[in-house]
């Protein structure tokens, strides 16, 4: 079975701009292509940031470009969130995604998209458990099962391993590859339209 590997980061605005596309690809191809999500660890460890006024200015410039290129909406609640000087740590939302890959793998793509929407449209803080519990409830995932794995040492270790694996494939987000019979083909680096992505996948299928 072909595999689509998606390297992203939950705090990457361009990845949010790409979220409708990855969800559409998943809905179309989930029965014939395996999807693997690899959060890349953009801001982790020593690179964890604070949502300072300088960072917010940087975000707003990029968000405008994302909206223009992708047509996605950034919510008013997100703009309110930008007024808070919260910590920006990619490890936490990445660990939430890794958790779902382990406890409900078939829901990883919808969960990942919902995590991005939680920040960029609904203005939710990705540092808080309640943000993920709300998504888990919406997707029918048992909340206690999620919490137990999410806070486990295994999840933390596996998230670090995922970062290391992601960097072998890409250093920029989003990047999309297709693996077919041991051969890897990059079909997206940055942003591509859904029609272009579908065409590239169809070529590789045939």
Predicted features and spans:
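Structural alpha/beta surface segment adjacent to cysteine/selenocysteine redox centers
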Residues: 19-119
């Amino acid at each position: 079975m072909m595999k689509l590997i998606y390297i992203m980061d939950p705090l990457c605005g361009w990845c949010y701009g790409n979220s409708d596309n990855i969800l559409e690809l998943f809905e179309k191809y989930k029965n014939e292509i395996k999807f693997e999500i690899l959060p890349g660890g953009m801001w982790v460890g020593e690179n964890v940031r604070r949502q300072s006024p300088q960072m917010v200015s940087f975000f707003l410039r990029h968000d405008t470009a994302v909206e223009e290129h992708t047509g996605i909406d950034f919510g008013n609640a997100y703009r309110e969130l930008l007024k808070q000087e919260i910590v920006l740590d990619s490890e936490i939302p990445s660990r939430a995604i890794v958790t779902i890959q382990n406890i409900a793998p078939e829901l990883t793509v919808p969960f990942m998209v919902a995590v991005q929407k939680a920040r960029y449209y609904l203005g939710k803080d990705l540092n808080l458990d309640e943000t993920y519990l709300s998504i888990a409830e919406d997707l029918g995932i048992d909340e206690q099962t999620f919490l137990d794995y999410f806070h486990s040492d295994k999840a933390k270790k596996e998230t670090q391993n995922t970062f290391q694996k992601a960097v072998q494939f890409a250093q920029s987000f989003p990047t999309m590859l297709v693996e077919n019979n041991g051969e890897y083909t990059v079909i997206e680096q940055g942003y591509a339209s859904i029609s272009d992505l579908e065409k590239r996948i169809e070529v590789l299928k045939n």
